UniProtKB/Swiss-Prot annotation:
GO CC annotation: nucleus
Quaternary structure (record): Interacts with RAD23. Interacts (via N-terminus) with TRAB1. Interacts with ABI5.
Entries under InterPro entries matching the protein: B3_DNA-bd, DNA-bd_pseudobarrel_sf, LEC2-like
Organism: Oryza sativa subsp. japonica
Primary subcellular site in the record, as a coarse category: nucleus
Family matches, as Pfam families: B3
Designated name of the protein: B3 domain-containing protein VP1
Highest taxon above the source species: Eukaryota
PROSITE patterns: B3
Compositionally biased intervals (Gly residues): 17-30
CDD domains found in the cross-reference section: BfiI_C_EcoRII_N_B3 (cd10015)
Length: 727
């Protein structure tokens, strides 16, 4: 710290002719009369601290935030070591220890010192400024009777002041009545440094620079003599207490804590501007305008912002004041808050803040000791399976307004998300399916659709499975037996009427060889493709779907599973018919529908006619996992029930259980077991029988149309549940 005078142009608020050197390192320095100060500077002898203050190699050098505790711009007469005025120096201390590099203002001249001297609050209060009366100690040191205090809570500046006071006694002319400096004054500073070794080091003391002319001029402006010297000393020590140590310790603790806990996170600020708890006197001063409060942190409302003692129970263990006109002096300076008070602060919601080390109840809780919770939203939301949450909570308010409101953009993003989820579900389904196969030893397991897609309600074990694929048990047993398995429903196989089931075994016997070859080929193809097929969607056909328009309206989930459409014209998709292995060239497109889309599958007329699909039937679309091609299959669920409903004797047959119906079922099952041609017919008969049993008790009082409609609904419901279970 440099208090040199005469090194720059005069800078003062008031009487420039009488100002003393009270300026700090960053800005202008206070000046005594130029001629007097230059003359004094020319004949001053500067003594290094090494002459009176021994080196302390055993003390750890706690590096301060800047290269030196106070930035100094001294003249050539100044020394970077800790110096003491050789002669005629008042016991004043660099009252200008403000530096621009430390972020504080400076006491620009002696006029500001005089402003500090004219405080309304008396110096001698009930509680002294420091634990020991520094003024009495210095006065005793001047008179040759030093009193060693236990803790003089000043800084390196405090030591410089006090040693400068000793030097002034040695000189013994300008400011006070001369008396020799005591020999044990260096020992007193050694003991003081020992008691404060955690906060100050010998290097910090050696970085302080002091000029005798500045001390003399300042003391002279304060009245001269011992009284002026003591007043100057008190002002300097007060300034050091309220600014320098409060700045140095929090910053040092923050830097150390940030380096130890998380070096990637920056320090919360180079100028925190904390004020420690007030318990002593409050002095209005213009010197307090030199520092800026920490702007990055605003105390929450729960804190209250009240100044409290470190040990007091309260939500805010330190005071953060934005006052420009007060300097808070604590009766117990620089004492960190207790762990209980710091715990209250962290429990009140400040745990995410990076606090100085002394505020944390444990060493590990300084700066970012709490990990940030993951903000990634869950991939699914409750209520609708497969619906992806957009994660808008992560968007800032500014980005929320830019969120695409266009239906097209929103649809594209939604489709992309659902496609990604569909791929993930597919992979998980494959892994689970393979693991189940290895565990059970069976080559065939239910498809991913039944395990991971839309929830299904399993039907009773006694119901015959009429679904798209035969039950897994039949597929497993087919390679081990000579009996052919019933193949998938083919489009060209004639469907029996209710009156034809009796001659069915004879027809099956005549065409046994051909059916055997066809069913064997179907088995191999089915066993191969069933492992690779993934269910995409199904659609119950309406009258418009099977009419002359030649298009089928697809459900909404088509936009997820089928190729993405960018234009209304759509894309051409080759669809392989699972039953006939014929490839149909269909066109997948959409119609704009009230800010939404209606998806269509065109060029389906030939497919519907070849499979003899009518209203109430449904189609199922698959994708081949390996090849990526699409497969389609038509399933008929209404023929037997509808034709039986049209006949007048259908109600009686179902109600009384005529032998003809069981005969139909048994014959159909037998035919399916022998030549594999009656699989679908037997399934239809079983569905019709189930439908008849379900509503047989209530068919007597209904019209034929009502009976037919109820049976169709029952058959459709049973077929969809059976299909889901079998798949």
């Amino acid at each position: 710290m440099d208090a040199s005078a005469g090194s720059s142009a005069p800078h003062s608020h008031g009487n420039p002719g009488k100002q003393g050197g009270g300026g700090g390192g960053g800005g202008g320095r206070g000046k005594a009369p130029a001629a007097e100060i230059r003359g004094e500077a020319a004949r001053d002898d500067v003594f290094f601290a090494d002459d009176t203050f021994p080196l302390l190699p055993d003390f750890p050098c706690l590096s301060s935030p800047s290269s030196s505790t106070f930035s100094s711009s001294s003249s050539s007469n100044s020394s970077s070591a800790f110096t003491t005025a050789a002669g005629g120096g008042c016991g004043g201390e660099p009252s200008e220890p403000a530096s621009a590099a430390d972020g504080f203002g400076e006491l620009a001249d002696i006029d500001q010192l005089l402003d500090l001297a004219s405080l309304s609050v008396p110096w001698e209060a009930e509680q002294p400024l420091f634990p020991d009366d520094v003024g009495m100690m210095i006065e005793d040191a001047m008179s040759g009777q030093p009193h060693q205090a236990d803790d003089c809570t000043g800084d390196g500046d405090t030591k410089a002041v006090m040693e400068a006071a000793g030097g002034g006694d040695d000189a013994g002319d300008a400011c006070m009545e001369g008396s020799d400096a005591p020999d044990d004054l260096p020992a007193f500073f050694m003991e003081w440094l020992t008691s404060n070794r955690e906060y100050i080091s010998a290097d910090d003391l050696r970085s302080i620079r002091l000029r005798r002319s500045t001390i003399e001029a300042a003391a002279a402006r304060l009245g001269g003599g011992r009284q002026g010297t003591m007043q100057l000393l008190k002002l300097i020590l007060t300034w050091v207490q309220n600014h320098h140590l409060q700045k140095k310790r929090p910053r040092t603790a923050i830097d150390d804590g940030a380096a130890s806990s998380d070096p990637q996170l920056p320090s919360p600020g180079a100028n925190p501007g904390y004020e420690f708890p007030s318990g002593g006197q409050e002095m209005g001063s213009a010197a307090a305008t030199s520092w800026m409060p920490y702007q990055a942190f605003t105390p929450p409302a729960a804190y209250g912002g009240d100044a409290m003692y470190p040990g007091a129970a309260g939500p805010f263990p330190f005071q953060q004041s934005c006052s420009k006109s007060s300097v808070v002096v604590s009766s117990q300076p620089f004492s960190p808050p207790t762990a209980a008070a710091a715990g209250d602060m962290h429990a009140s919601g400040g745990g995410n803040m990076a606090w100085p080390q002394q505020f944390a109840p444990f060493p590990v809780s300084s700066t970012s000791s709490y990990t940030m919770p993951s903000v990634v939203p869950p991939p699914f939301t409750a209520g609708f399976p497969g619906q992806y949450s957009g994660g808008h909570a992560m968007c800032s308010p500014r980005l929320a307004g830019v969120e695409p409101s266009s239906t097209k953009e929103a649809r594209k993003k939604r489709m992309a998300r659902q496609r990604r989820l569909s791929c993930l579900q597919q992979q998980r389904s494959q892994q689970l399916n393979l693991s189940q196969i290895h565990i059970s030893g069976h080559p065939q397991e239910p498809s991913p659709r039944a395990a991971h897609s839309a929830p299904v309600t399993p039907s009773s074990a006694g119901c015959r499975s009429w679904g798209i694929w035969p039950p897994a048990a039949q597929i497993i047993q087919n390679p081990l037996s000579n009996k052919p398995n019933p193949p998938p429903a083919t489009s060209k196989q004639p469907k029996p009427s209710p009156e034809k089931p009796k001659p069915k075994p004879q027809a099956a016997a005549t065409a046994g060889a051909e059916s055997l070859q066809r069913s064997t080929a179907s088995e191999k193809r089915q066993a191969k493709t069933d492992k690779n097929l993934r269910f995409l969607l199904q659609k119950v056909l309406k009258q418009s779907d099977v009419g002359s328009l030649g298009r089928i309206v697809l459900p909404k989930e088509a936009e997820v599973h089928l190729p993405e459409l960018k234009t209304r014209d759509g894309v051409s998709i080759p669809m392989e018919d699972i039953g006939t292995s014929q490839v149909w060239n269909m066109r997948y497109r959409f119609w704009p529908n009230n800010k939404s889309r209606m998806y269509l599958l065109e060029n389906t007329g030939d497919f519907v006619r070849s499979n003899e699909l009518q209203e109430g039937d449904f189609i199922v679309i698959y994708s081949d996992i390996k090849s990526g091609k699409y497969l389609i299959r038509g399933v008929k669920v209404r023929r037997a029930a509808q034709e039986q409903g049209n006949s007048s004797g259908a109600v009686g047959k179902h109600k009384h259980g005529s032998p003809e119906k069981p005969g139909v079922s048994s014959n159909t099952k037998a035919a399916g077991a022998e030549d594999g041609t009656g699989g679908d017919d037997s399934a239809e008969a079983a569905a019709a029988a189930a439908a008849g049993k379900a509503d047989g008790g209530g068919c007597k009082g209904k019209s034929p149309h009502g009976v037919r409609r109820s049976r169709q609904e029952a058959a459709a419901a049973a077929s969809m549940s059976q299909m889901a279970v079998s798949i």
